[in-house]
């Protein structure tokens, strides 16, 4: 069996920054450090940070006075931000991905101008909750759609005063279909100046599409609650190839590999490379040969951590 590796795969700049913020806060201020929601959606990362002194919470009320709090990479609503600022916290750091913040600013701008806004996204995802929570104009409207059917059923106040934006980790193909429906249903709707789906999501979907063309099956390293990882597995399955979303090498079932001559491996944007290396090692134990990395788009984007945290610290082992 041959192993093919998608390129690019794994950590994106926003995830790298968010993890670094938690690591550096622990290094500088000591444990415990409180983080609202999982800083990124990856079990290995979250468990590793817990071992180092991070405490993940869902409600600001769970944070003791005098503590240090970090918002996750997914972002928070205006209400959550205001609640945190009203508390007696020693420090408050924001690990929201800058590309999510871009979408927040689009929604806030629409709210200020009194435009109704439609968000394309998955209900219940923390990024969607944070983005929807940037809209506060009682005379306008903020709506969530996930599919073309949602668009056809949507009623707004003023079809001539509409804009839309998207969650950053969606399927490029699915989102295109929803945008087509929006443009048909509301001809005067205005979209973002630049695509809201982030570069990492787009690049990893393109890479896994290329991978699936050559592989018999594809293993996607990522946690079940990772939106972008799920989209990678779904894309492969739609191409007619088996795809399995796995947290680690331990999840690999030998029968998946029966008859496969070429195994593709990729990783979601929140999955560290150590997990990919462990998957490769496990596949070799099961009889696979050396791994070959495909060519792909080069990524050199870096997002700086807050200036208060710009010190050198050891990374997660």
Curated annotation (Swiss-Prot):
* Active site (UniProt): 127 (proton donor)
User: Which cofactors does it use?
Assistant: [4Fe-4S] cluster
- Positions that bind (2E)-4-hydroxy-3-methylbut-2-enyl diphosphate: 41, 74, 125, 168, 226-228, 270
In the record, what terms sit under GO molecular function?
4 iron, 4 sulfur cluster binding; 4-hydroxy-3-methylbut-2-enyl diphosphate reductase activity; metal ion binding
Q: What is this protein called?
A: 4-hydroxy-3-methylbut-2-enyl diphosphate reductase
Q: Which domain of life is it from?
A: Bacteria
A biological-process GO annotation? terpenoid biosynthetic process
